[in-house]
């Protein structure tokens, strides 16, 4: 899966040291709402432009009338066995939140939890090097970090970015009539579960890895299109979950064309083998009441937790051609997967 600098014994498989995998480790939206319901008095700062209120991808702090600072963190347990690749994926996923706001990353620090009595330090070194590789690809330094002795391997980054406030994109600012586009196919949770269940064929091992290692750098350019009204990345809550956040924040309903949702190669084959991650069921349990009646097949795709997934874009009809041209120029299939409308039903997402 990678050109790791050190060859590991065949007996070391990182996914066997964790109970979860990637963004599928995320606490469910329902439980997270309980955790974040603070009992303390409300404290506000007028310069905090984006905080917890909108469940956005990162926090944004206004430095002056022109520039804002973006701050985010993301970490998880191994989603692949190879340590270098795990570190690279975890870092790519963390950096994505900066691009999802329309910003540019400027620095990162590492977060490492390591079972020092179970796994050699040399393995952790490869994980950190994978993270360093992703940072280099994003043009930033891995400037430091913090580590603890932990029962399971954990790795990720805290990332700082900057943004011209005129380019800032949020997940709750979509408008009725916007078209929906997705920059990466769905199915990462299915394929990584196939690996964990030892069903993944060797010739398919690169499919999810290549997708997860692809930086969402295009987000910085997408944000410069004035007709892009909302932007977010699709990660652990699945396409349906992150689309719901977009709908609920803007008080809109999404008309989603299920058959247009792009899927990773072989995802349907492994889905037929029962490779459904636990995160899929947790996701549906958390927000299924806001969805139309779904078949098990539809649930498995729409609620599939993504790790380092693509960007979900809401763009006006007037700016759609500009977005399509940009996606084409970056060799991303410009497939419209739906639209946003003024609500006419109780469900926030309807299928057609």
UniProtKB/Swiss-Prot annotation:
Catalytic residues, chain numbering: 23
Sites annotated Important for catalytic activity: 26
TM annotation in the entry: none
Enzyme class label: transferase
Gene3D superfamilies linked: PurM-like C-terminal domain, PurM-like, N-terminal domain
GO (cellular component) term, any one: cytoplasm
EC nos: 2.7.9.3
Positions of Mg(2+) binding: 57, 97, 233
Name under which the protein is recorded: Selenide, water dikinase
Native source organism of the sequence: Shewanella baltica (strain OS185)
């Amino acid at each position: 899966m990678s050109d790791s600098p050190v060859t590991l014994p065949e007996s070391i498989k990182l996914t066997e040291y964790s109970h979860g995998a990637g963004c599928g480790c995320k606490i469910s939206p329902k439980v997270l709402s309980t955790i974040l319901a603070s009992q303390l008095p409300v404290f506000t700062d007028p310069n905090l432009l984006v905080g917890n209120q909108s469940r956005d991808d990162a926090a944004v702090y206004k430095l002056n009338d022109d520039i804002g600072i973006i701050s985010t963190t993301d970490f998880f347990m191994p989603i692949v066995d190879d340590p270098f690749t795990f570190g690279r994926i975890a870092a790519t996923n963390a950096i994505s939140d900066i691009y999802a706001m329309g910003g540019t990353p400027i620095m990162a620090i590492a977060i490492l939890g390591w079972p020092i009595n179970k796994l050699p330090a040399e393995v952790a070194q490869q994980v950190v090097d994978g993270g360093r590789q992703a940072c280099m690809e994003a043009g930033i330094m891995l400037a430091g970090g913090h580590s603890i002795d932990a029962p399971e391997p954990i790795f990720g980054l805290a990332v700082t970015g900057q943004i011209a406030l005129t380019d800032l994109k949020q997940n709750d600012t979509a408008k009725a009539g916007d078209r929906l586009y997705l920059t990466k196919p769905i199915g990462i949770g299915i394929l990584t579960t196939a690996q964990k269940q030892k069903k993944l064929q060797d010739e398919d091992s690169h499919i999810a890895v290549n997708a997860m290692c692809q930086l969402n750098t295009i987000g910085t350019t997408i944000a410069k299109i004035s007709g892009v009204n909302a932007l977010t990345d699709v990660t652990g809550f699945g396409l349906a979950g992150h689309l719901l956040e977009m709908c609920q924040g803007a008080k809109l309903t999404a008309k989603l064309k299920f058959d247009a949702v792009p899927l990773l190669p072989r995802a349907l084959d492994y889905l037929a083998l029962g490779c459904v991650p636990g995160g899929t069921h947790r996701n549906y349990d958390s927000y299924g009441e806001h969805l139309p009646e779904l078949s098990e097949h539809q649930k498995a795709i729409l609620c599939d937790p993504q790790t380092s997934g693509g960007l979900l874009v809401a763009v006006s009809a007037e700016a759609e051609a500009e977005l399509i041209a940009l996606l084409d120029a970056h060799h991303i299939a410009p497939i419209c997967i739906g639209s946003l409308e003024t609500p006419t039903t109780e469900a926030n997402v309807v299928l057609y």
